[in-house]
Curated annotation (Swiss-Prot):
Compartments, as annotated in UniProt: Cytoplasm
Protein name from the UniProt record: Heme-binding protein 1
GO molecular function: heme binding
PANTHER family cross-referenced by the UniProt entry: HEME-BINDING PROTEIN 1 (PTHR11220:SF22), HEME-BINDING PROTEIN-RELATED (PTHR11220)
Organism annotation: Bos taurus (Bovine)
Disulfide-linked positions: none
GO cellular component terms, semicolon-separated: cytoplasm
This protein's UniProt keywords: Cytoplasm
């Protein structure tokens, strides 16, 4: 636990590499199209719980792994944003399922430490292109869902994206009270 806190407060912070391809807006919604680099990710999946509750279960596991709860006992530093996939129902409500994706820092990409917790998996993920919109505050599932709905409305028929899931992201540690950065990412579809 101490390693997790130390890493969160004093560890290095790396930004997940991406390139802005374009920017747009409609009404009050500003968005970017980004090409995000792939790589190795530490993932935790939680089902049968509402998103906010599932996130409270999954995040400490990822933070402990990054903070040194791994086979090498290494605190790896942070990569932001931490993203989690949510799965909307047909009515827009979020299903009781979530998957946290933490991009392993570049220094450890070729040989990431093995997690001590069996619920954490190391997965390779291809690069993705996303439509992203940003907002502040302490975000909850309802905030992410509202922002996703606004982004979908802003994109309307101008962009194709996955509809079975989207990513919610956070850039800040929980103890940061002001200037928080959250985003919703709709994954561009090739269809």
């Amino acid at each position: 636990m101490l390693g997790m806190i130390k890493n969160s407060l004093f560890g290095s912070v790396e930004t997940w590499p991406w390139q802005v391809l374009s920017k747009g807006s409609k009404g009050d919604v500003f968005y970017e199209e980004r090409a995000c680099e792939g790589g190795k990710f530490a993932t935790v999946e939680v089902t049968d719980k509402p998103v906010d509750e599932a996130l409270r279960e999954a995040m400490p596991k990822v933070m402990k792994y990054v903070g040194g709860s791994n086979d090498k006992g290494l605190g790896m530093g942070m990569t932001v944003p931490i993203s989690f996939a949510v799965f909307p129902s047909d009515d827009g409500d979020l299903q009781k399922k979530l998957k946290v994706w933490f991009r392993i820092p570049n220094k450890f990409q070729s040989d990431p430490p093995a997690p001590s917790d069996d619920s954490i998996k190391i997965e390779d993920r291809e690069g993705i292109t996303v439509y992203s919109t940003q907002f502040g505050g302490y975000a909850k599932a309802a905030d992410y869902a509202a922002q996703a709905a606004q982004l979908r409305s802003a994109l309307e028929s101008t962009a194709k994206y996955q509809t079975d899931f989207y990513f919610c992201t956070g850039y800040d540690p929980p103890m940061k009270p002001y200037g928080r950065r959250n985003e919703v990412w709709l994954v561009k579809s090739s269809e």
